[in-house]
Amino acid sequence: MCKKEKHRLVCVTQRTACEGDFFRQMEAILSMKPARVILREKDLPLSEYEALVKRLLPLCQKAGVPLTCNGPVPGWTLPGCGVQLSFANRNLRGGGECGFGVSVHAPEEAAALRESPAAYLIAGHVFPTDCKKGVPARGLDFLRQVCEAARQPVYAIGGITPERVPQVLQAGAAGYCVMSALMKTANPVQLIEKFYHQEETAYEL
């Protein structure tokens, strides 16, 4: 069964960025109960991706954290996992009781999904990020417009640091996604504590 989200942080994986063991890194992250984990490892053959899902899913279930697949084959998932789709593949749906999310890059896309059964949207990239070198960030105004156009909760992605969390939440986002920082840090628990602290102070400004 997929449990209800509590925190606002979504962990997006990038196993190749981990200096140490990927699963030890994930165990530390899962101990902090993020809203969900999105397994984004599109470079893997499907057989290897499936093996990774089967190894990570029990860890997520033990922690009570939903696992979402975003692998090499659009719409592919396993029982017990959600699925993340691009806007182009939005009609694939899937994810069973864990549902599916859709990535959007324009307010018009969010508006087009108002009648969709998608559980949530991911909007980005909001701030400059090494993952999108040379591509201009869309900014907080873009995020506000997406949140206003959407029916579903919106999660921001791209260059999210603890210090930027208040701006993201005040723009209307339900939460935010973090990838590289969580994969590269030697102390994920300490980093996530900083993110959670900013969640608590977001509306005190």
Identify the meaning behind each predicted range.
Residues M1-Q84, N89-Y120, V135, Q145, ...:
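Conserved N-terminal beta1-alpha1 strand-loop-helix module at the mouth
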Residues F127-K133:
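A short acidic, helix-capping loop that chelates divalent metal ions and anchors anionic groups
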Residues G124:
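Flexible, gly/ser-rich surface segments that form the specificity/activation loops bordering the active-site cleft
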Residues A174:
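Short, glycine/charged-rich "phosphate-handling" switch motifs in NTP-dependent
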